[in-house]
Curated annotation (Swiss-Prot):
This is Xylose import ATP-binding protein XylG. PANTHER family: CARBOHYDRATE TRANSPORT ATP-BINDING PROTEIN MG119-RELATED, XYLOSE IMPORT ATP-BINDING PROTEIN XYLG. NCBIfam families: PRK13549.1, xylG. Residues 6-245, 262-507 form the ABC transporter domain. InterPro entries: AAA+_ATPase, ABC_carbohydrate_import_ATPase, ABC_transporter-like_ATP-bd, ABC_transporter-like_CS, ABC_transptr_XylG, P-loop_NTPase. Belongs to the ABC transporter superfamily. Xylose importer (TC 3.A.1.2.4) family. GO terms for cellular component: plasma membrane. ATP binds at G38, E39, N40, G41, A42, G43, K44, S45. It catalyses: D-xylose(out) + ATP + H2O = D-xylose(in) + ADP + phosphate + H(+). The complex is composed of two ATP-binding proteins (XylG), two transmembrane proteins (XylH) and a solute-binding protein (XylF). CDD domains: ABC_Carb_Monos_I (cd03216), ABC_Carb_Monos_II (cd03215). It is found in: Cell inner membrane. It comes from Burkholderia cenocepacia (strain HI2424). It is an enzyme of class 7 (translocase).
Length: 519
């Protein structure tokens, strides 16, 4: 067995006296891919920030050895010089710069006199992409011209340009399509063959099983186990992550489906940058009280834009006819939608769901502050009572209600956003990718909440790129393709193949909506 490239022993990191890491061990060998698994808040990101120098030596206890010698990094530059490079879940690219400029950002090739040698950077960037067998990216084009999948590949090329010996991938496929994920996994396998080690952090355990040689599981800041992937099953990994078995991920509860509460007709949205292009093209559907409607489709199909249009949040030109309980609505903003009884948990919680500068509690009450106002002042005691009640009801885990929401795990941030929207007492709740970047334990909690809301008569629209999630939750499934409604199916014996078939059909061949959506 080869000598370890990296050894972390007894890593302890505390914040305000509370241990986020409590004696964590991690070993990685050259050419090995180690899966790092744990629930949101388990300490995975904190451990990687220790390793990558975000938390410098001296701010944590324990030992890190790199290539057999102690590593005492004072910052990220030190670890990158050593060959440790992290690719964060939120990509660190500058959209306006070219692909080549991003690959060399902070590591530019210069000419005598200090001017940048753009020709050399373009040539080397092209070489790096060829090494990764990527031929679909023009290095002279701005990064903004490429989607999330290509941007992830650009980040990998950027890491290799820093001569990475250990590549840390933090939820690398969270915004990728299935085909883009396959390309990513092929690249990870190729890097392993070249001797590059990887730490692969993901809640998608099928990906962990596909590329990882060993798996390290941490829970509540402690090391649980490190075992060869060949000896593990996904159920076993989940049990180690959460400390219990999750037997029924989709606990379908009987719920009565009533009359139509929301009716949407002829939604059409124009592209923000090209008004001749339609992002949503004449979509009509309805949702009944207590019904869970899943919305499926390929990335870029227009699902999010459709939901934004209903919620009054679409940034471009949009036309639609919307009625609630038979009464016409005029929705020009999210505030109008909330007043009408429509709430939405957005796809990108960090940009549109939370205010990172505020605490957890103030994020939760943000949409209903008027409820606590009296004579121009906020009743802080009443607000705090509500915050504590909602945090307990949705199991939002935070040391105290005023802790910065930015410091919480993705799962706890998502539950805080849900709490905020539920305080508006909606009749219709739109959930756009509600479990993206959320661990399996938090997923189960969110699913239970969805079924509980349906039992209370709330109409739910759940947009998801995960077809098992759509099939596990929905009473009915809408399929969107190229901005059009390609299918409307009752979820009885429905398969993933049927959904994908509808999504991929050319518009003129797409099936007409079934009677499932008839009012």
């Amino acid at each position: 067995m080869t000598e370890p490239l990296l050894t972390m022993r007894g890593i302890v990191k505390a914040f305000d006296g509370v241990k986020a890491l409590d004696g964590i061990d991690l070993t990685v060998r050259p050419g090995e891919c180690v899966g790092l698994c744990g629930e949101n808040g388990a300490g995975k990101s904190t451990l990687m920030k220790v390793l990558s120098g975000v938390y410098p030596h001296g701010t944590w206890d324990g030992e890190i050895r790199w290539e057999g010698a102690p590593l005492a990094a004072s910052g990220v530059r030190d670890t990158e010089r050593a060959g440790i490079v992290i690719i964060h879940q939120e990509l660190m690219l500058v959209p306006e710069l070219s692909v080549a400029e991003n690959i060399f950002l902070g590591n530019e090739i210069t000419l005598p006199g200090g001017r940048m040698n753009f020709a050399a950077m373009v040539q080397r960037a092209e070489e790096l992409l060829r090494e990764l067998r990527i031929d679909t990216i023009n290095v002279a084009q701005p990064v903004m011209n490429y989607g999330g999948g290509h941007q992830q590949l650009i980040e990998i090329a950027k890491a290799l340009n820093k001569h990475a010996k250990l590549l840390i991938l933090d939820e690398p496929s969270s915004s990728l399509s299935a085909s883009e994920t396959r390309i990513l996994l092929d690249i990870v396998r190729d890097l392993k063959r070249r001797g590059v080690a990887c730490v692969y952090i993901s809640h998608k355990l099928d990906e962990v099983a596909a590329v990882c040689d060993t798996v390290t599981v941490i829970r509540d800041g402690r090391h649980v186990a490190t075992e060869p992937m060949a000896t593990l099953t996904t159920d076993r990994i989940i049990a180690m992550m959460v400390g219990r078995e999750i037997r029924d991920l989709y606990p379908r509860e009987p719920h009565e489906i009533g009359d139509v509460v929301l009716d949407v007709r002829h939604v059409t949205c124009r592209d923000v940058t090209n008004a001749r292009r339609k992002r949503v093209d004449d979509v009509s559907f309805s949702v009944r009280r207590g019904e869970i409607v899943g919305v499926a489709g390929l990335v870029g199909a227009g699902r999010t834009e459709l939901m934004q249009a209903i919620f009054g949040a679409y940034p471009g030109a949009c036309t639609a006819s919307v009625t609630m309980n038979g009464k016409p609505l005029s929705i020009r903003s999210p505030a109008d939608a909330i007043r009408a009884g429509i709430a939405m948990v957005p796809e990108d919680r960090k940009r549109h769901g939370i205010v990172p500068q505020l605490g957890v509690g103030h994020n939760i009450t943000l949409a209903v502050l008027r409820r606590f106002a009296a004579r121009g002042r906020i009743d802080a005691a009443a607000e705090l009572d509500t915050i504590r009640t909602e945090m307990q009801r949705l199991s939002v885990r935070a040391a105290h209600p005023f802790l910065s929401i930015a410091s919480l795990s993705g799962g706890n941030q998502q539950k805080a956003v849900l709490a905020k929207m539920l305080l508006t007492e909606p009749q219709v709740l739109i959930l756009d990718e509600p479990t993206r970047g959320v661990d399996v334990g938090a997923k189960a909690e969110i699913y239970r909440l969805i079924f509980a809301l349906a039992q209370r008569g709330v109409a739910l629209i759940v947009v998801s790129s995960e077809l098992p999630e759509v099939l596990g939750l929905a009473d009915r499934v809408l399929v969107i393709g190229e901005g059009e409604l390609r299918g409307d199916f009752v979820n009885q014996g429905l398969t993933q193949e049927q959904i994908l078939g509808a999504a991929l059909k050319p518009a003129r061949l797409a099936a007409e909506p079934t009677a499932a959506s008839a009012t």
